[in-house]
Every structure is written in structure tokens, then in C-alpha cells.
Amino acid sequence: MDFALIVAPIVGILALLFAFYKASSIDKANPGNDRMKEIASFIEEGAMAFLQREYKALLMFVAILFVVLIIGINWQTAISFLVGALFSALAGYFGMKVATKANVRTANAAMEEGMNKALNIAFSGGSVMGMSVVGLGIIGVSILYILFPDPAIVTGFGLG
């Protein structure tokens, strides 16, 4: 097996571990007073409702395109597409959960501890989404390439 196929999933796992580390550091930050927590809970509820509705709409598109790929190309590319869509949804979910937590903590840090602390929390929140996308992307492409060692098949992952 090629060295890159061994190292790449490890790098993906490290990216996800970094994302989880950053997410846990955001969780530890002070979310502020009761009113701030209440507003943050409304924002989180709205964000999760949005994602749920968006994912329901995307599910129909993913299902149709999955069938089209099976018929038009091959089942391996269709599976790659499905894995890509799933990993994309996971990254979006992680990103949204952390972003809603980071927002209130950033606002509170700006009020109580200053701009440097607030920017640190805000950038940490953004890095969770970025590292989730990178980690899941590298892991997904690596595993699919190990299973289907044809770059044309793995391109379905990117479509997802």
C-alpha cells in the first residue's frame, strides 16, 4: 500500500481531533448572563431547525442523483457521492453547533475580557468548521481510494 494512503487518513483524524479540541475549548468559555444564554438558545434552536429543513430538502436531491449516478456511471461513483454528501452534512452540523455556541461566548468575551479573547473564541469557532471539512474530506477520499483505486470513481465524493 502506498505511504500516502496510510498517512492521509491519519492526518484527517488529527484534523478532526484538533476540531474537537477547539470545540471543547469553546464550550469552556463563559456564555454570559442568563439573558445572553436565553438568546443563544433561541439562535441555536433556529439554526438547528434551518439545518433540519435544509437536510430534508437535500435528501431528495441526493437520492435522485444517487440513482442517476448508478444508472449513468456506476454504483461505485454513486457510493462515493453518497459518502461525500454524508460527510458534508456532518461537517455542516458540527460547524453550525459550534458556531452557535461560539457566538454568545464571543460576545461575552468582548464585553468582559476584551477584543483579543473574543477574537480567539471567534477564530476557534471558525477553525472547527474548517478542520471538520478538511478532516472528513481527507478521510473520505482516502478510504474511498483504498476501496476503489480509480480517481474517476472517487470524484463522486467531491460531488457529494
Model-derived segments and their meaning:
Residues 1-160:
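Hydrophobic, small-residue-rich transmembrane alpha-helices and their short perimembrane loops
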